Amino acid sequence: MSAFDIAGSGPTSRVYFSQRLRLHYVDWGNPTAPPLLLVHGGRDHCRNWDWLASALRGDWHILAPDLRGHGDSQWSPDGNYSTAAYVYDLAQLIHQQELAPVTIIAHSLGGNIAIRHAGVYPDKVRKLVAIEGLGPSPKRMAAR
């Protein structure tokens, strides 16, 4: 894909379903390239990655999901925003779009989800970059 083919065009909004939730993601095209997931942090949305996706889309098939309860994704009616639920949602996107093994760049909450996803599904992740994705220490969590 040449820079001319992609200049000035934005991503396509798409949806997938996980645990009966309608979840949103954007697809930056270039489906024959290696897959790259960009996972945002808490209180954020998928379009926060536009600057990076624009720069990398010539070499990657980039998808950026809105986590449940974020952006254009549905809120959980039962209030389930557990890490396990987020990990499952990410696994569903990777499975339904046949992205594995996938490279993931993730920030904050997204980094925490991606690290846990890689631990549960190591064969589904080619490479992982987690930016500030560790979260609170076990000692701090125990004090809560």
Question: Model regions: which residues?
Answer:
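Conserved hydrolase catalytic core segment
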Residues: 100-141
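Conserved HGGG/HGGXW glycine-rich cap/lid loop of the alpha/beta-hydrolase fold
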Residues: 21-75
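A conserved amphipathic alpha-helix that caps or lines the catalytic cleft of carbohydrate-
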Residues: 53, 94, 117-118
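Alpha/beta-hydrolase fold catalytic core
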Residues: 1-36, 57-60, 98-100, 135
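Short aromatic-enriched loop/helix-cap "lid" or pocket-rim segments at secondary-structure transitions
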Residues: 74-77, 139-143
